[in-house]
Design a protein with these regions (language model features):
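Short, surface-exposed acidic-centric catalytic microdomains
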Residues: 25-72
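Flexible, gly/pro- and Lys/Arg-enriched active-site loops
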Residues: 53-58, 76, 81-180
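NTP-dependent small-molecule kinase module
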Residues: 170-182, 310-384
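Conserved lysine of the Walker
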Residues: 195
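Hydrophobic positions on the alpha1 helix immediately C-terminal to the Walker A/P-loop
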Residues: 198, 202
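Conserved substrate/cofactor phosphate-moiety recognition/catalytic segment
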Residues: 204-245, 265
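Glycine-rich phosphate-binding loop used to anchor ATP phosphates in small-molecule kinases
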Residues: 231-293
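A glycine- and Lys/Arg-enriched "phosphate-lid" helix/loop adjacent to the NTP-binding pocket
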Residues: 266-336
Length: 384
């Protein structure tokens, strides 16, 4: 078997936006580039500056470095298509500037070019401090000394004295970086809905850690399904203690996807305990909740009971063999009613989704979660 080595070319791109959600356009474009046969290596700081060459709104600008096997023309077409998907309509009129949601320019490439469609290096970058400053940052971060020397020379000769104001947020290179810099994402839902499967898939795609429920460590669980009245309290207290201890150890960690949170204990206690036992349980739960950090994002999976029963039967866990449809319906209803107040909640109806076996279904779920994670990051930086 022979493997053909693919030559990767290094490019530097400039990104700008002065319309709508400027940061969202730029950050999303970087993520999208990274998933199109392109590896985003480094991002500069984000800067705000006044529009140049026309009277318009202030711009956000940044530069990135990428490696790709695409040719310069192929890369240009990717960038133009991405601009179009963000609502940019380029004009063919010479030297015409206007407000735009997304602007992507090829600044430097492996070879010089000069034709009607593309010129490298970019013919006007030497006149623009908002290009040269972030470009220098990226070249320095990659220790690209040859380009760095040329950029430093251009900066020393640049007559552009406009002010660049740093924006207080770090641009990320990929969705993997977004997950690694996000607070814990919790995937919950009824028994058999696919929480653990989705957690494992997300962890594999974004190279993050999982934190999964340890059902087998609860010695009362199998007895509970045989005699719920006798074993409900010890079962729920054991789960509460186990969850609180495990989650408390993760309070300061990021980049984790979990298939439960401490609120799961309250939900099942409400379902399974009599009033007297529930009062005792709530005393321990109140203390445990204070010691546990809220999740960054709470995702609730839902499915009809018929599907849940089918999945439970397929995985054939002995301690789940006694679960009946009425109990599943109570749990499902409790989740749908009880978590409407969770912050940053996303409810996903999996009735017609097979995210384990269908890539498109899994991609759709990832898109929904990624959208919320990015929105949450911008909100936390007061930049939404």
């Amino acid at each position: 078997m022979y493997f053909q080595l693919v030559k990767l070319n290094r490019y530097y791109l400039g990104l700008g936006s002065n319309e709508d959600a400027r940061l969202t356009h730029i950050q999303t474009a970087i993520f999208e580039l990274n998933e199109q046969q392109i590896n985003v290596l480094s991002c500069s700081a984000l800067y705000e500056n006044e529009a140049q060459g026309f009277s318009g709104k202030a711009f956000y600008n940044a530069c990135i470095a990428i490696d790709t096997a695409l040719s310069s023309r192929e890369l240009l077409q990717r960038c133009l298509s991405l601009e179009l998907s963000h609502g940019r309509a380029r004009t063919h009129a010479p030297a015409t500037y206007q407000d735009r949601p997304l602007d992507i320019d090829l600044l430097l490439g492996p070879d010089s070019m000069n034709d009607s469609d593309l010129t490298l290096p970019h013919p006007r970058m030497a006149q623009r401090r908002f290009v040269l400053e972030p470009l220098r940052e990226v070249a320095a971060a990659l220790k690209d000394l040859q380009n760095l020397d040329e950029i430093e020379l251009l900066l020393s000769q640049c007559r552009d004295d406009s002010t660049l104001s740093p924006v207080n947020i770090r641009l990320l290179c990929s969705y993997t970086d977004l997950w690694k810099n996000s607070e814990m994402v919790v995937i919950e839902g009824c028994i058999g809905v696919g929480k653990t499967s989705l957690c494992n898939q997300l962890a594999a795609r974004y190279s993050i850690d999982t934190h999964l429920e340890r059902f087998e460590s609860n010695p009362y669980l199998s007895h509970f399904y045989q005699d719920p009245e006798a074993y409900a309290l010890p079962t729920e207290l054991h789960f509460l203690a186990d969850r609180q201890q495990a989650l408390h150890e993760l309070n300061e960690k990021k980049g984790i996807v979990a298939d439960y949170h401490i609120s799961k204990s309250a939900l099942f206690a409400q379902l399974n305990l009599n009033p007297q036992d529930l009062a005792l349980f709530n005393r321990f739960y109140s203390w445990s909740k204070k010691l546990t950090k809220a999740p960054g994002l709470y995702v609730l999976l839902d499915a009809p009971v018929e599907q849940l029963e089918k999945r439970i039967k397929q995985r054939a866990r002995s301690y789940e063999s006694q679960i009946d449809s009425a109990y599943l319906e109570r749990i499902r209803s409790a989740y749908l009613k009880g978590h409407t107040s969770e912050e940053a909640q996303l409810v996903i109806d999996t009735t017609h989704l097979d995210f384990v076996n269908e890539q498109a279904d899994f991609d759709r779920i990832c898109d929904q979660i990624n959208h919320l994670l990015l929105a949450q990051r911008l909100t936390n930086h007061n930049l939404a």
